[in-house]
């Protein structure tokens, strides 16, 4: 993965853990965080509130590989959870996971739907139904997708786009409970259906006596 796909964030080790020390970190403009992983000791760290919010707004951190700089060490991690205050919405805590470059990881990738206004089915009165807004995938860390774009322009009423219709790289494995589920469909409106069946019947030829 190129540097363009990696987000760099500074962190510092926390000497004291628990509710009291965590509150002190927040009062001083920090965000408590933990880094965990298989066969690794967990690290308690804190982040700069200002830096993290800036990076969080500018990139979808949950689908970016993160280079966490902890003192003079660098750790590659994924952001796994962000806890927010229920009233103020301020970030209270962040969970990161250590990454092993040789081991596949599972992530939820957002689906971006494009050309809805050009969609044939919508222009003809159909109703767009989005069934999934994310796709669960497994891949190596250097193959992470930030998002998946789905072009709706050619979708017609009564048709769907399924997982198998997506042009995904071969190194991406889709992990879904259903086999090849539909992601988006266009359903016909009742008015459209009535319009299709409201053609005046052809008059039968009159017989002359």
Swiss-Prot record:
The keyword Mitochondrion belongs to this UniProt entry's keyword annotation: no
Polar residues compositional bias, start-end: 199-209
Pfam families (alphabetical): Ribosomal_L25p (PF01386), Ribosomal_TL5_C (PF14693)
GO-annotated molecular function: 5S rRNA binding; structural constituent of ribosome
Any one GO CC term of the record: cytosolic large ribosomal subunit
Keywords of this entry: Ribonucleoprotein, Ribosomal protein, RNA-binding, rRNA-binding
GO biological process, one term: translation
Function: This is one of the proteins that binds to the 5S RNA in the ribosome where it forms part of the central protuberance.
Record's subunit section: Part of the 50S ribosomal subunit; part of the 5S rRNA/L5/L18/L25 subcomplex. Contacts the 5S rRNA. Binds to the 5S rRNA independently of L5 and L18.
HAMAP family to which the protein is assigned, alphabetical: Ribosomal_bL25_CTC (MF_01334)
NCBIfam families: bL25_bact_ctc, PRK05618.1-2, PRK05943.1
UniProt protein name: Large ribosomal subunit protein bL25
Species name: Ehrlichia canis (strain Jake)
UniProt gene name: rplY
């Amino acid at each position: 993965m190129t540097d363009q796909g990696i987000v760099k964030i500074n962190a510092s080790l926390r000497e004291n853990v628990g509710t009291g020390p965590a509150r002190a970190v927040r009062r001083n403009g920090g965000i408590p965080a933990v880094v965990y992983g298989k066969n690794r000791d967990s690290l308690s760290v804190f982040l700069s509130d200002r830096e993290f919010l800036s990076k969080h707004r500018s990139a979808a951190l949950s689908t970016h590989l993160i280079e966490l700089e902890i003192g003079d060490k660098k750790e590659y991690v994924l952001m796994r959870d962000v806890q927010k205050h229920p009233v103020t919405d301020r970030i209270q805590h962040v969970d990161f996971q250590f990454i092993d470059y040789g081991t596949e990881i599972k992530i939820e990738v957002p689906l971006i739907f494009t050309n809805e206004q050009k969609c044939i089915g919508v222009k003809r009165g159909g109703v767009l139904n989005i069934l999934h807004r994310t796709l669960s995938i497994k891949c190596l860390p250097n193959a992470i997708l930030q998002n998946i774009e789905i072009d709706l322009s050619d979708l017609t009423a009564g048709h769907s786009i399924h997982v198998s219709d997506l042009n995904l790289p071969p190194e991406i494995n889709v992990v879904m409970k259903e086999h090849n589920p539909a992601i988006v469909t266009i359903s016909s409106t009742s008015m459209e259906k009535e319009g299709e069946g409201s053609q005046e019947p052809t008059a039968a030829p009159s017989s002359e006596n």
